[in-house]
């Protein structure tokens, strides 16, 4: 397959299965909480978990989702795999998070896992994307918009910080398009001025993300 070795293909498949381990569902089960797919927005991600159950399970969920992107990509990087194989490992983990085989192919929206992939590619790339995410979130206080802007800029950051590695740029651009598609309801609310702010009043329950 397009010049990939058997071990690289196996690694890509393994990354998909790793990505399919839904941090939100697993964390909530271990902590005796509800199923985030059945409550709030129905999205098994850190934002919904935070709104439903608080900061601690949300932080663990966020870390777990990021590690699903960081670990396989960093390992492929350290193993000296081809640039295409490295980014396809990240893509597979990202797709696993969105469409997990272990949870009925109903996964999250992919922001944290994509951010983890960026850190796995290189620390400067990850820092650039994360920095953009945090800066926009602080200024605009809209979680979905900060994620969309940060991931939209990810291909540009890779081009500038990875010597124009077009395999990484191209696959990351595809990931960004998929992520935008997964956020289409958020985008509709943004255009209507109805999207939730990050900081909500205690007890508020407008589960839209």
From Swiss-Prot:
Membrane-protein topology: Multi-pass membrane protein
Keywords: Cell inner membrane, Cell membrane, Lipid biosynthesis, Lipid metabolism, Membrane, Phospholipid biosynthesis, Phospholipid metabolism, Transferase, Transmembrane, Transmembrane helix
Segments crossing the lipid bilayer: 7-27, 85-105, 117-137, 142-162, 166-183
UniProt key word Transferase: yes
Keyword Phosphoprotein in record: no
Pfam families: G3P_acyltransf
Catalytic class of the enzyme: transferase
Location(s), subcellular: Cell inner membrane
UniProt-listed GO biological process terms: phospholipid biosynthetic process
Principal location listed in the UniProt entry: membrane
Family the entry assigns: Belongs to the PlsY family.
NCBIfam families named in the record: glycerol-3-phosphate 1-O-acyltransferase PlsY
Name assigned to this protein: Glycerol-3-phosphate acyltransferase
Organism per entry: Hydrogenovibrio crunogenus (strain DSM 25203 / XCL-2)
């Amino acid at each position: 397959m397009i010049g990939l070795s058997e071990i690289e293909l196996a690694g890509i498949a393994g990354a998909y299965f790793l990505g399919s381990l839904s941090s939100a569902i697993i964390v909530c089960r271990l902590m005796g909480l509800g199923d985030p797919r059945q409550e709030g927005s129905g999205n098994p991600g850190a934002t919904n978990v935070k709104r439903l159950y608080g900061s601690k399970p949300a932080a663990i969920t966020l870390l777990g989702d990021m590690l699903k992107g960081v670990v396989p990509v960093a390992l492929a990087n350290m193993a000296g795999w081809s640039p295409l194989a490295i980014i396809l490992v990240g893509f597979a983990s990202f797709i696993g998070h969105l469409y997990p085989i272990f949870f009925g192919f109903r996964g999250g929206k992919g922001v944290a896992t994509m951010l983890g992939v960026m850190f796995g590619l290189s620390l400067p790339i990850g820092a650039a994307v994360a920095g953009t995410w945090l800066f926009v979130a602080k200024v605009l206080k809209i979680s979905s918009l900060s994620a969309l802007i940060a991931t939209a800029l990810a291909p540009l950051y890779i081009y500038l910080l990875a010597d124009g590695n077009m395999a990484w740029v191209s696959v990351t651009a595809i990931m960004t398009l998929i992520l935008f598609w997964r956020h289409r309801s958020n985008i509709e609310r943004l255009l209507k001025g109805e999207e939730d702010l990050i900081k909500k009043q205690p007890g508020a329950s407008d589960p839209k993300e």
